[in-house]
UniProtKB/Swiss-Prot annotation:
Keyword check for Oxidoreductase: yes
Location in or out of the cell: Cytoplasm
Pathway connected to this protein: Cell wall biogenesis; peptidoglycan biosynthesis
Domain FAD-binding PCMH-type: 16-188
Annotated GO MF terms: FAD binding; UDP-N-acetylmuramate dehydrogenase activity
Keywords per UniProt: Cell cycle, Cell division, Cell shape, Cell wall biogenesis/degradation, Cytoplasm, FAD, Flavoprotein, NADP, Oxidoreductase, Peptidoglycan synthesis
Official protein name in the record: UDP-N-acetylenolpyruvoylglucosamine reductase
Family label: Belongs to the MurB family.
Lineage, uppermost ranks: Bacteria, Pseudomonadati, Bacteroidota, Cytophagia, Cytophagales
InterPro entries according to UniProt: FAD-bd_PCMH, FAD-bd_PCMH-like_sf, FAD-bd_PCMH_sub1, FAD-bd_PCMH_sub2, MurB, MurB_C, MurB_C_sf, Oxid_FAD_bind_N
GO cellular component, one term: cytosol
Length: 339
């Protein structure tokens, strides 16, 4: 049945939070989605689109309709001397796409290995890791407007990408459902090894040649060492964004805290590592009942088993208040909080 009622969501979010959706649909095609949206009895419902459930926190049950996008398929649209264009369904697992590209020799997303979630969520969040952002390989996407049923194509400019952000998280939030994404990948790789511990790990791995496979292997190793596997410990990866502040404020913080890591950006701003701010505020390894902060990565809030969404959210708010008090910096959640 295309529309189900009172469906448990615990297995559909990587936090492993027990919550229930009033209505739920697993959507495997564009035609199926259009048919469902034509049901007038569903028009007034709150709607939530999910993919892998890896960037979401249910603080309570969802009294609306959860639309679970599962449109699959990877199609090569074309190529020239330098690039390959791929058309990818929103329901394709992101890491599976990365592995597919590595196997084919398509470069550009190897630094984004092992990021959980689906392709349809990647442009919403403008996912990024280890010096690379999704927007760098993005060409366009097709999305269905919920209110009209019309399909619109968005180019890079229309998506208004910024750090872990896009128009689909701001002015168009909840108005469109992404169906397919087109990526422009490179035939000749430009290796990004200057971020994090990639160079150090590559040196220990000693690959015969530097390749996109070697970069991916290094990133996978780093992520597996630092981040808990949600199959065993519930989490949504990085809970907070790295805050961006103006350089004047960064200078004040540097004067007060000489060891604070500051990454100067080209636009007159600076980025601070949220993990450092959280750790310096004393939260690393914190645990209260079933909820806590990961021992190795302070950016990750974890559910050790049986935690409620309210308990996770309460901890997140306490961390925000603590960092704001200590550093006069407000951390912004990267996770989509449903309350």
């Amino acid at each position: 049945m295309d529309l189900q009622e009172n469906i448990p969501l615990q297995s559909l979010n990587t936090f492993g939070i027990a919550a229930t959706a009033r209505y739920y649909s697993l959507v495997k095609s564009q035609a199926m989605l259009k048919q469902l949206l034509n049901n007038s009895s569903l028009h007034s419902l709150l709607k939530l689109t999910i993919g892998g459930g890896s960037n979401i926190l249910f603080v309570k049950d969802f009294d609306g309709w959860v639309i679970h996008m599962d449109i699959k398929g990877i199609e090569k649209l074309g190529e020239d001397n330098n690039h390959i264009w791929l058309h990818v369904g929103a329901g394709v697992n992101w890491h599976s796409l990365v592995l597919y590209c590595i196997e084919k020799g398509y470069a550009g997303i190897e630094n984004l290995s092992l990021i959980p979630g689906t392709v349809g969520a990647a442009p919403i969040q403008n996912i990024g890791a280890y010096g690379v952002e999704f927007s760098e390989v993005f060409e366009s996407l097709e999305a269905l407007e919920i209110s009209t049923g019309l399909i619109k194509k968005f180019n890079k400019e229309a998506c208004a990408f910024s750090y872990r952000d896009s128009i689909f998280k701001s002015s168009l939030k909840g108005q469109y459902i992404i169906l397919q994404v087109t990526l422009r990948l490179n035939k000749q790789p430009t290796f990004q090894t200057n971020y994090g511990a990639i160079q150090e790990v590559l040196a220990s791995m000693k690959p015969r040649t530097l390749s996109i496979k070697a970069i991916s292997d290094a990133v996978i190793y780093i992520r597996q060492q630092k981040l808990p596997n949600p199959a065993y410990i519930g989490n949504a990866g990085s809970f907070f964004k790295n805050p961006i502040i103006d350089q004047a404020k960064a200078t004040l913080l540097r004067n007060k805290y000489p060891n604070i890591p500051v990454h100067i950006l080209a636009n007159g701003y600076a980025k601070l590592p949220a993990a450092w701010l959280i750790e310096q505020s004393g939260w690393k390894g914190y645990r209260h009942d079933a909820v806590g902060v990961h021992l190795h990565q302070p950016l990750v809030i974890v559910n050790y088993g049986g935690a409620t969404g309210k308990a996770v959210y309460k901890l997140a708010q306490a961390i925000q208040a603590s960092v704001a008090e200590n550093f006069s910096v407000m951390l912004e959640p990267e996770v989509n909080i449903i309350q």
